[in-house]
C-alpha cells in the first residue's frame, strides 16, 4: 500500500516566501525525488507546489519536464504563469498545444514542455524512438482524476505506461482536487508513488442545497428565501452578492438555458452590473474577453455551462448551480463548487445547488480503470513503432505495465486489430513485431486509429480529381462526420453564390441534401478566403470555430501520416490549407497571423503597408512606429489599448525571432552556468 501524508493546518511563511503549511510539506516531500499523488481543493495552491518541485528537479538533474493539462485554455493559462517564473533563466518554455510547437530538437537545453495529453503522448513516443526518454526527468499530470475519462484518459494512461515501460527515471506528480481515496491509493501503488492529501482551502467554503425556497446545510434548514417575480430566487441571491462587492457564476444545464437565464436576470438586477453568457456558441476570443471582463469586474455575473468549470480558472464569490445534465458526475459538481471563493479577494465563498434541477450521478469510489479500444490500439502501435515492444514477451510486459484492469484483453484485441488493418507486422523468422509505414505515421500523429482507413480512402478519391485552385475539397475532407449544431441552409443554396472554382469543387465532392459537413466546409473556406460569413450559414461562431479546430487537428495528423506512406504532395497541400485554417487568412498574410495579437484583419492592413513578416515589424524600429500604423486602422480604439497592443506585438516578434534562431542552431548548447529561479 502506498505511503500517505496528510496536511490539516494552514499557513506558514519562511525565508521571505509565503507558503501554506501543506505546500511546504508537499514540496519537501517532492524534493526527495519520489513521485507524489497530490489531492488538494481548487485554489489551494497546487500549481505553486508543482513549480517548486519541477524547478528543484531541473536544477538537480537538468533535462526536460512535461507539464500536462487536459485543455488548451488551461495550457495557455499555465504557460503564462510558468513564463513569468522563468524570467532571467536559461530554461526554455515550449508550448505544444493548439497547433503550436513541433519536435524538440535541442535536447541539451533544459526545457519545460506544456502540452495536452495527446501531444505529450506523441512527444514521449518520439523521445523513445530517439533514445532520449532518459532526458525526461519530470512529468506532472494535472487533473489526474481524468485518467478515467473516456476521451483524455487514454492518452494520460499511455504517457504513464510508457514512462514505466521505458524504465524512465522521471519523477511523476499527479494532481487533482476531486480524486477519490481508493483510486488515489491504487494510482500511487501503480506508480510507486506516495500520496499527499489536504482539505485546506485558503478561502472558507459554504455549500448549500436549495429545495423550494429553503437553503439547507447538511439536511438542516439554514435560510428561507423570499418570493416575488424571481421564482427561482436567482436574482435575489445574485443581488445580495453584488451588493457585497462580489461576483456570481450561474451554471446552467444547456446553452439555451444560459441565454434564457441571463435574459430573465437582466431586469431583476438592482445595480448597473453587466450580465454575460459563456458557452460554446461564443468564439474563443469572445470567451477570453468575457473571462477578462469578469476578472476585471466590468461583468459581475456570468451564466455558463459546466465546461467553464473544467476549461478555465475563473473563481467567483458565489456559485449557483442551477441545473446540470443527468449524466454529470459528482466530480464535475465538485469542480463547479470549487470555483466559489476568490483567494486574496474573498474571506469566504459559497455554492448553492438547486436540488430540484440537478440530477447528477454519484461516482463510486472504485479503484478500477478501464482501457478503451482506441486507447489500447494507439498504445500498441506506439510501443511497437518506438521499439519498446518487439517480442511476444514484450507484449506481456506492456500488459503488466498498464494501469487498466482490463488491459490484458484490450491489448490482445488491439494487437489483432492492428495486424489486420496493416499497422503492424509479425516477422516469422525473427519472431518480432514491427510497425508498417502506416503504423509509424499513425504513431507520430495524434489521430484515432479507426479514422485512418476512411480518411486515406477519401484522400485517394481526392487525388483522382482535385480542383487545385480551390481549398474547398481539402477542407471538406477534414471536416469530421459529426460536426457542430444544426444548419439552417442547404448545400444547394450555397452553391448558387459560389465562384466558378468552388462550384467545380462542390460538383466533385458530390453535394447531397442536408449535408452539414458541406455547409461547414463552405463556411471555413469563406473564412480563409477572407470573405464575410456573418449570418450566412445559420450556425454559431462557436460551432464554426470548433469545426475549424477539429479540421486543424485532422490536417496536422494527416500531414504526418501522408508523409510516412509516400504521399508527400498531398501532405504539402493539406499542410498549407491547415496553416490557413489556423490563421483564418490567405497565404499572403499567413506569416503575420502567427504573431500573437495579430489576427487576419490586422494582418491584411499591415500587408497593405508593406509589412508581411516578423522581420518587417522589427525593422520599423520602435513601438511608436507600429502604433502609428495601427492607429490609422483602428479609429474607434483608445490610444492606450493600441500602445499596449503595439508593445505586445513587438515583444512577441522579438521572442519569435530569438526562438527561431535557437531552432536553427540546435546543436549549439547554451554555455556558461545555468540560472534558476530561487526556490525555498
Name the predicted role of every residue range.
Residues 1-28, 32-36, 204, 259, ...:
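Helicase-associated low-complexity/disordered flanking segments
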Residues 301-324, 350-353:
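A short beta-strand element within the Helicase C-terminal
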Residues 118-121, 128-172:
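SF2 helicase catalytic motif II
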Residues 47-48, 63-84, 121, 177-183, ...:
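Conserved Walker A/P-loop ATP-binding site and its immediately adjacent core
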Residues 161, 173, 177-263, 358:
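Conserved interdomain linker/interface between the two RecA-like ATPase lobes of SF2 helicase motors
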Residues 323-362:
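Conserved segment of the helicase C-terminal RecA-like domain
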Residues 28-35, 47-61, 161-163:
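Walker A/P-loop NTP-binding motif
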Residues 382, 390, 404-407, 411-425, ...:
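C-terminal helical accessory/scaffold domains
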